[in-house]
Structures are given as C-alpha cells and as structure tokens.
Amino acid sequence: MAKDDKKKALDIALKKIEKDFGKGAVMRMGEKVDTQISTIPSGSLALDAALGVGGYPRGRIIEVYGPESSGKTTVALHAVAEVQKRGGTAAYIDAENAMDPAYAEALGVDIDSLILSQPNTGEEGLQIADTLIASGAIDILVVDSVAALVPRAEIDGDMGDSHVGLQARLMSQALRKLSGNISKTKTIAVFINQIREKVGVMFGNPETTPGGRALKFYSTIRLEVRRAEQIKQGSDVIGNRVKLKVVKNKVAPPFKVAEVDIMYGKGISQTGELIDMAADKDIIKKAGSWYSYGDDRIGQGRENAKQYLEEHPDVYEEVKEKVREAYGIDAKAIEERENPEKVKQDKEVPVNKDASDEKK
C-alpha cells in the first residue's frame, strides 16, 4: 500500500472510531490539549512537594493507607477542603459510618455542600461512586474505606462462612469500570485503606492491604501514612507527628517523604510544616533553639515560632511564597496547568501603541 493510501485509510479509520465512540476516543498525541498534568493541592505544602507535581493529579486514583488512627481520613478531608475552596464539588462514600461532621468542618470542609453516602454493601457503595463520577460533576470522591466495602454475599451469609477472594473480585471488577470514567471526567478518586498482616510470613514485610491487588495496580499514587511520635504540651498529648511516604507515583519520582503535625481537633498544622520546610531551605534560620526570619527573632522553640507566624499573617504569606518557590511548588506554574487558555490570553494582552510611541 502506498504511503498516501495508508494515510487516507488511517484517516477513515480514525473518523469511524470517533463516530462510533465519540470525540476524543482516539487521537494523535501531538493533538492532545491536556498534555500537562492538572492538579489540586493536597492541603499540605510538604505533601505537595513530596508528590512532585504540586498536589493530587486530576483524573487519577489515589490510595491512602496505613495503621489505625494514623491520620488517613484527615489527609483525605484536607484534600476535600482544598477542592471546595476552589469552587469544586466533593463526594464522600462513608462505608465505615464514622464520618465526624464537626471534625471535618474544623478542617475547612463545607459540610452543607458535601455529598455524603453511607452504603449498606460494597456493591452499593461502588455503584454510587460510579454514578457520581460518570455524571462529570464531581471533582473529588473519597471512599472511606476499602476494607469496609463488604460484599453483599458476606452480609447476607452467616457468621463464620468462608468468602475467599470475594472482596478482591469486587474491587477488581469495580476498578475496571471506574478507571475509564475517572480519567474522562478528570475526577480525583481517593481510596482510604487499612493494613492487615499475612499469616505465616517469616521473611519480608507481613503487612498487606485489603481488597486484593487491583487497587495497587490502578493507583497513580499510593500514600503510606504512619505515626512517628506524639506531640506533647507538658504531660498532655495534643497531636501526632506523622510520616507520609509516597510509595508509588506515576507522575513524578516516588519514595519521597513528608513529615507533618496532625493536631487533635485541628488537622494538619500548616504553620508547623511551613517552619520545617523554611528551616530546611534557610529561609528561616535556626540557631540553637531560636528561630529567626530576616533580622527578626520569631521565637524560642518551634511552638513559639509557630505562634508568631499565626499572629503575623503577612509574614506567614511571605514565608509561604518563598517556600513554594524554593521547592518548585510555584503558584504561577500551577495556574498555567489549571488554566492554560487564561494564561495565554494574559500573555497576549496588546501593548498600548501610543504609550510605546511616547517611549520612543
């Protein structure tokens, strides 16, 4: 077949595919408009830096897993709050029936506009998730948690009945269906998962996550959340130091670690992580126990430095901008990814001819 005939045959095939399956079903990579990864901030500056792209990528699956009470739900709720701040719509599939509206509100979540579902079975929860995602109206959907998505057969059966691999099959089937809609609608799907231990493992890591291997494969990002140490005020425990490890990342280099303070009743301490990140880049100087910014001493000890930044929002914003720049979490770069057309229009604003003539 001649080269021109091949080109014509390919064009006919492409047109037929578009007619049968809709525009965008197939395209040349050079024609694809959305070559940049569009993201939404995670609610933690340290985590945004660790993720490598400034936040959670749109149209992708994120798995957040870890031991009990490590801060998994807190991490997910911060992402929900960030989406809502930007005018987006969030949905929450509460399979554990453990949603605390007061705590979510303290983290900045708009409870009134949050779409909440508490399904009775795993099939029901995943069907609701698929319907919401397919609508194209949801920006972020959280499933809390995969371990609580119990198959109907297990709920209807008797205690002690064996249902080997039932939940894994359910997740595998659901993710095959969900992944396409998630990508098309640019929805961020966050699956919270628990940790289990394999019986009889002598060597290697005995820990695993429920729901089979499908979620591991389909996830663009896998976040491991673990408590590092307690945060105390005198003898009272007021929070936990938490490590967020990016175990898998398809959009940037993996294995980066972010450390954050999760305070009881308040969530991630954004001021605390800002001080740590600024100190690492010498934006805030640390000499002994004293913290200094510019020529000013801002506090003796980390807690006093945090208090200073909380009381001086102008200094806080100034330090934040410098930290974003130092770590490559540039707000302008994110805007270019989010609104490339708007940025292009701003760049193409015509110069006032009279003003330019006067300069000459």
From Swiss-Prot:
The keyword Cytoplasm applies. Gene3D superfamilies: P-loop containing nucleotide triphosphate hydrolases. GO terms for cellular component: cytosol. It is found in: Cytoplasm. CDD domains: RecA. Keywords: ATP-binding, Cytoplasm, DNA damage, DNA recombination, DNA repair, DNA-binding, Nucleotide-binding, SOS response. One of its GO terms (biological process) is SOS response. Residues 330-360 are annotated as: Disordered. It comes from the Bacteria. SUPFAM superfamilies: P-loop containing nucleoside triphosphate hydrolases (SSF52540), RecA protein, C-terminal domain (SSF54752). Signal peptide: none annotated. Disulfide bonds: none annotated. InterPro entries: AAA+_ATPase (IPR003593), DNA_recomb/repair_RecA (IPR013765), DNA_recomb/repair_RecA_CS (IPR020584), P-loop_NTPase (IPR027417), RecA-like_C (IPR049261), RecA-like_N (IPR049428), RecA_ATP-bd (IPR020588), RecA_C_sf (IPR023400). Its main location: cytoplasm. One of its GO terms (molecular function) is ATP binding. ATP binds at residues 66-73. SMART domains: AAA. Can catalyze the hydrolysis of ATP in the presence of single-stranded DNA, the ATP-dependent uptake of single-stranded DNA by duplex DNA, and the ATP-dependent hybridization of homologous single-stranded DNAs. It interacts with LexA causing its activation and leading to its autocatalytic cleavage. Belongs to the RecA family. This is Protein RecA. It comes from Lactobacillus johnsonii (strain CNCM I-12250 / La1 / NCC 533). The gene is recA.
